[in-house]
């Protein structure tokens, strides 16, 4: 079947366009910066949104491997402020295997998405006042191939892992900057959440290695951000029990029994006594929404929706998760991390469908991605954003079921130490009510790097209110929490997220 995607990077049309731009210095115009971008990448309008786009948008494919036809899909949102000077940020969602349109649709993209009324009807789009494109240009990348709208003509490419994903994403960046050379002078950052706690440091490592090796084009890489990200088997695996105790989800007796039986080692149980103690922990928290313990958990359409008033949350928590988001937080929290007490381990990573079958007969709880699914599987939307049609590459899924993924990068501790040791800035943040990748583990591993504290633990504020807590270290490392937020921080606390994002990019203290 004929494909409707963009021409490959090697096409004469693109080569001529780049030559003309470089030879004659094509400048900005019309409020944007991308004058060299191929015309086939321009997004003129998006179905579901009435009115002019708030900035220039571009989308399409970059072929990272010609022989196999391995193509990664991106969506670029130019900064609404000053795209010629503002930072450029690559955004990656996790999984592994989950689409970065998760971030575009539900978190910090240019639009807020409102359901069209049924599962297949086109959603209504409204401008997002807290979009991260207010202060930066953002590239949303579906990676690796097989995720979201990215694909390969050779399905053997869907057998992949951390290191291959990082290499492909680096190839993507090098080719992308050839298409958009205007951005080479902009400060460039890599950001992501959840399993992107692996994607971000490994890709950052590839970029820095390329800079050391003199690879062209030269990327103006400055640093990276990780939100509620996985990092290390031990730190991640031991985080849940102290978190649950600190949040009053388990009693002192249960906590002390687990401590005594497991000797503080909760992730790799070796005795029946420890396993029995952890079973009591799991039983106490099993009905909560692990991605945000403040949010109701919807198990399926056949089960009546619950409210915070009849969950196991202490009454004092019931209003902590209030949000300024104009539309309701989605009812699904599946797709970006792990089941309880299942830290990242070396070797093959189970697919989300396998996790679902292994956890509950009805599938993974707290899930409903109808808005994103309806929009991204609409034929007009696919055409508008230059994505291959459903008839060609299949339906968009929030998390793919085609990957056979290997975690082969090991602990991220050494990556963080290496990158920050070379002077690259790092912002590590946690929604403090995420039980999937709890802040307790993240705070512990950032502290374990051994850097001196230069900004002692303190609250950070927005509009005169405490929005979370932060601690700054040597070598440009910052740890921060966001009060009342879950696993996908901008989804719950969009205003606070734009605040910490813009402050950190500007080099200001939170």
Swiss-Prot record:
Belongs to the peptidase S10 family. PROSITE patterns: CARBOXYPEPT_SER_HIS, CARBOXYPEPT_SER_SER. Its EC number is 3.4.16.5. It catalyses: Release of a C-terminal amino acid with broad specificity. A motif (Microbody targeting signal) lies at residues 508-510. One of its GO terms (biological process) is proteolysis. Glycans are attached at residues 154, 268, 418. Keywords: Carboxypeptidase, Disulfide bond, Glycoprotein, Hydrolase, Protease, Signal, Zymogen. Disulfide bonds join 98-399, 262-274, 297-366. It comes from the Eukaryota. InterPro entries: AB_hydrolase_fold, Peptidase_S10, Ser_caboxypep_his_AS, Ser_caboxypep_ser_AS. Residues 1-25 form the signal peptide. This is Serine carboxypeptidase 1. The active site is at 194, 434, 487. One of its GO terms (molecular function) is acyltransferase activity, transferring groups other than amino-acyl groups.
